[in-house]
Amino acid sequence: MLIAQRPTLTEESLNPQRSRFTIEPLEPGFGYTLGNSLRRTLLSSIPGAAVTSVRISGVPHEFTTLPGVEEDVTEILLNIKGIVLTSEYDEPVVMYLRKSGKGEATAGDITPPAGVTIANPDMHIATLAEDGELEIEFTVERGRGYVPAQMNKQDNAEIGRIPVDSIYSPVLKVSYRVEATRVEQRTDFDKLILDVETKPAISPRDAVASAGSTLVELFGLCRELNTQAEGVEVGPAPVAEETNPEMNIPIEDLNLTQRSYNCLKREGIHTIGELVAHTEQDLLDIRNFGMKSIDEVKEKLQSLGLALKASPLGNFDANNLEGGTFFSPEDE
């Protein structure tokens, strides 16, 4: 059986609800295969909770108004669709909102049952006047994707029960791109970069884990056709090495010239650990990054007892290296 190098998955947290995941190295072509599958699954198949119907006291249907309430019922329903929920129950549950007197009614005024959490309590629902009074009964269900109000409508529903569009998906945006990456002498491997933004109901990490679990279950159906069939086997995980804390230092702390710094940032090199993973030739391949920049980087790294990939640590004599692949500042 062919054995492929085990890819590594790293997460860069951009904010609590957005992360960038990098998976590399992948066999040529697998970047798009994996990226497209994850994106579609994240957008359509991550389970979540949403309001499916409401009953508003004194309201027979959605095309009406309430005395003492600034918004009409249609506007209130639009606001209700923006409530972000989590629910531990597979069956429908009910929660209530009761508000009277002048002020703003928000999702934080709702009383949910145990096991149901409102992730955005500041969500505006309605504005009440002095004589305003608002009582709403919400039905909450779990599901996936998007379900229009028409599909939430029940034939035997009581009068005044108004179905609502349900946006179950806790994932807001997913994008990906595939770049080439080097493995030893080969440069045709894929690096998948996946950008995921979610609602407060779930973290990007948990959303990607859920999508991966779903895909494993589905692709497992194909494997069951013949469990003895050969495929590409992913190799073992590399043995973890002791992490040097200096590897996490941002390159800003190297005090490089603006030209060198901008070139490295544009290439996506943000830390010293990412920098020392490159060879001199890798850096020379960066646009506008020449030998003066190489010498500057090597000098800064040498002061920390570090060196570029495949470079010897500390001082060295370039004349002793075969092929002349390394140069000291005096060689120019």
Curated annotation (Swiss-Prot):
Pfam families: RNA_pol_A_bac, RNA_pol_A_CTD, RNA_pol_L. Keywords: DNA-directed RNA polymerase, Nucleotidyltransferase, Transcription, Transferase. Residues 1-226 are annotated as: Alpha N-terminal domain (alpha-NTD). It comes from Bifidobacterium adolescentis (strain ATCC 15703 / DSM 20083 / NCTC 11814 / E194a). This is DNA-directed RNA polymerase subunit alpha. HAMAP family: RNApol_bact_RpoA (MF_00059). Belongs to the RNA polymerase alpha chain family. DNA-dependent RNA polymerase catalyzes the transcription of DNA into RNA using the four ribonucleoside triphosphates as substrates. GO terms for biological process: DNA-templated transcription. Homodimer. The RNAP catalytic core consists of 2 alpha, 1 beta, 1 beta' and 1 omega subunit. When a sigma factor is associated with the core the holoenzyme is formed, which can initiate transcription. It catalyses: RNA(n) + a ribonucleoside 5'-triphosphate = RNA(n+1) + diphosphate. The keyword Transferase applies. The N-terminal domain is essential for RNAP assembly and basal transcription, whereas the C-terminal domain is involved in interaction with transcriptional regulators and with upstream promoter elements. The keyword Nucleotidyltransferase applies. It is an enzyme of class 2 (transferase). One of its GO terms (cellular component) is DNA-directed RNA polymerase complex. Transmembrane segments: none annotated. Gene3D superfamilies: 5' to 3' exonuclease, C-terminal subdomain, DNA-directed RNA polymerase, insert domain, RNA polymerase, RBP11-like subunit. Its EC number is 2.7.7.6. The gene is rpoA.
